[in-house]
Amino acid sequence: MRIPLGTVLWEETAFRGVLQAALGRVMPGGPAVAVTSCIFGLWHIGPTAAALRINGLAGGPGKMLAGVSAGVAATAAGGVLLSWLRTRSGSLVAPILLHVATNSMGALAAWVITRPER
């Protein structure tokens, strides 16, 4: 439950609620979303590297760099969508719900893949 729920409220409040709003006061909306999303992607370097190591996918510095880079890019792209939802809805509720759904699907997929066969 920590992955789907424990990080979402904190991350959405920090990134879309505080950072995006603060940057939106000093720069246009598009650049504020881009900066927020890039920082959101970079925030996930540690968890992505840990997931690659735990699942035996690191395979050396080159593979680790490629995997982390892909994870950061995907998370930053997701951040753009979450930021768009924040802007479009005027609320944190929509990005929180999408973030919970995304994290929950990832946790469910990991559980299905790693559970013992019956």
Task: For every predicted segment, state its role.
Residues 1-118:
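Transmembrane helix-loop-helix hairpins at the membrane interface
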